[in-house]
Structure formats: C-alpha cells, structure tokens
C-alpha cells in the first residue's frame, strides 16, 4: 500500500496558564506530520503532482532536488520515500549533524555545500541538477516555500480545521483569529489560499508572528514594499528567509492580517515552558506562535478587541526538527533567558 505524503493532524483545545480562567486556544499539531512539520503538506503535494505530470524532458523516474538547512529537506525526503523516488538535498555547512542524519535516514542523498542556504541552493540548481539533466533524468526543483503548488498543499490545513470545528459543533463565527509563524511566507500563503477558497479570508484575520532578526515581513510592511534582509540573526533559524514571497506580502494588506514580532528570549522561554507543561519539544519557529497562548494580551492588543470565553483562536503549531531540548537550554543560557 502506498504511503501518503501527509497526515490529518489533531486540532486540540489546550489550556494555558495565562491568567485567564478559560482557554480559547485550539492548537493544530503539525509536528505529527511524516516530515515533522507542516512542510510535508505542500512539498509532498508538489512532488506527488510533479511525479504524475513530470516537469522536464527525460526518461525514468523523477529525480527530486531540494535545498534546505532542515525542515524542507526532511519533508522532501520523507515524501520521496513514500513514492519510491530518488531525492538529493543540499544543506549549508551550518546545518546540525543531527539534522543531516535525519534527512539521510529518510532516504535522501545529502550534500553539504556553502556557508548559507543561498550558496547551497545555487550549487543545487546550477551544478547538481544540470548534471542530472545531462544524464537524461526528469528533474524537479523543490523550493523551501516560494511555489504556488506548495501553497496549494499547505492550504489543506484550513480544510481540516473547518472539518474539525464542525465535528466539535463549533461555529466559524466564534473563530476570532488564526495564528501562524512566518519566515518566507509559505505557510501563511497556504493559509490565505485555504481561507479564500472557503470564503473566510475576509472574516478570519491571520496573525503573522516573526522573531526579531528575521522579521522580513514586518520590515517589508513598514517600508511599504518587499525588502531583502542582508543578515539573519534570530535563533529561530527555520524562519530565516532573506525575503518574503510576493503573494504573502500582497495578501497581508488585502485581507487585513496582523503582524507581531517577538524577541528570541521570549520565544525560547515559551519553548521551555511548553516542554515542561506538555512534554512537547518545539523549536523557536513553532514557539513563536505558541507564545501568544501564554500572553493573550498581545493577541488582544493586535486584534484591538477583547477575546471572550466563547471565542476561539486557532494556533498553527508548525512543527520542526531543528532543535533538541538541550539546544533550547543552551540557547536560553547564552541569551540569559530567565
């Protein structure tokens, strides 16, 4: 039996010790995806769709190429394993050995090249893929986030949420916001597409959470046009994109979305607190969204409204495998997180 490239993940009502007597947070646990993050949805969808209708001339099976320092590469590797496809992932030298082993264990060939993702990506596209094409193979380039077919796959998260709310007899007007972390804007774009398809994009505001040091969306919004970050300094490395997808930037103002930027210290504190409370280890990219569960005043301030007992906020816990608990403790110690 063929494996699926993604799973329907639970949407769980969770109570947070945040000073409120009742919790209105429903958390969507994307860490339970085959690749450990939401990226299994979109990247898996791109690979499956391309495998059915190959993008380039050639013969034989589709050869998949991904450049990533972590989660996107793991998503590509696990998706390819489910379809019995060859997968090559180029990672920069900064990638943790543990993450390299994870990607290799999922069946991919891993090449370490370059000091950052840009150099790894350049090597992948202009050297490895060129060599493969010369051998007559059908090739697919998998960008970590900036691809409409990937967004289409990510949009299934909205369909699931609507279905799960219905199963729990929760009416959509009770949902006051949907919170997600933003790096390059892949997840955000998928959520917007899913909400729009279900005629909810103008009814449910999306709160985009970033960390200072890789807050490319917020900086672009302040300038009024997309910017490119010269340096990416946040501990939330999975959010470290030098640019925001143009669709994400354009959709933000079109649909009245909200932007929140958090410090590394706040996000790390939340990751450790969440691990203590729920025995779930989340990396900082995921902890950024969960931070609002512990600090609902941030949410009420950005939405400019009170959230009442009967209201609901959806949190996308995007997942990710880039940090262990020990990594979180070490980073917290370095940044003097109390």
Swiss-Prot record:
Keywords on record: Cytoplasm, Gluconeogenesis, Lyase, Pyridoxal phosphate
Pathway given in the UniProt record: Carbohydrate biosynthesis; gluconeogenesis
The protein's required cofactors: pyridoxal 5'-phosphate
One BP annotation, GO: threonine catabolic process
Catalysed transformations (reactions): L-serine = pyruvate + NH4(+)
EC number: 4.3.1.17
CDD domains: L-Ser-dehyd
Compartment(s): Cytoplasm
Annotated Gene Ontology cellular component terms: cytoplasm
Chief localisation class: cytoplasm
GO terms for MF: L-serine ammonia-lyase activity; pyridoxal phosphate binding; threonine deaminase activity
Modified residues (N6-(pyridoxal phosphate)lysine): 39
Family named by the database record: Belongs to the serine/threonine dehydratase family.
Protein name: L-serine dehydratase
Native organism taxonomy: Eukaryota, Fungi, Dikarya, Ascomycota, Saccharomycotina
